Amino acid sequence: MKISFLLLLAIVICSIGWTEAQFTNVSCSASSQCWPVCEKLFGTYRGKCMNSKCRCYS
């Protein structure tokens, strides 16, 4: 049972699309500051502030 759980967990982790997030060097303190940056750079308003840097999602 434990092996099947670990196998399922490994499959889920491997199937996550890591390339969907785009990192930027733009400093931020709130996610709302990233929305215009993401629109300008990647054409999408979906973004958030992580570790004081904007991260945009496609």
Curated annotation (Swiss-Prot):
Residues forming coiled coils: none
Name of a matching Pfam family: Toxin_2
Signal peptide stretch: 1-21
Source taxon at top rank: Eukaryota
SUPFAM superfamilies named in the record: Scorpion toxin-like
Aromatic residue of the functional dyad, annotated site positions: Y57
Residues annotated as transmembrane: none
UniProt-listed InterPro entries: Scorpion_toxin-like_sf, Scorpion_toxinS_K_inh
Keywords for this protein: Calcium-activated potassium channel impairing toxin, Disulfide bond, Ion channel impairing toxin, Neurotoxin, Potassium channel impairing toxin, Pyrrolidone carboxylic acid, Secreted, Signal, Toxin, Voltage-gated potassium channel impairing toxin
Main location: secreted
GO terms for cellular component: extracellular region
A single GO molecular function term of this UniProt record: toxin activity
Tissues/organs with expression: Expressed by the venom gland.
Subcellular location as annotated: Secreted
Disulfide bridge partners, by residue number: C28-C49, C34-C54, C38-C56
Role summary: Potent blocker of both large-conductance calcium-activated potassium channels (KCa1.1/KCNMA1) and voltage-gated potassium channels (Kv1.3/KCNA3 and ERG1/Kv11.1/KCNH2).
Homology family: Belongs to the short scorpion toxin superfamily. Potassium channel inhibitor family. Alpha-KTx 01 subfamily.
Name recorded for this polypeptide: Potassium channel toxin alpha-KTx BmKcug1a
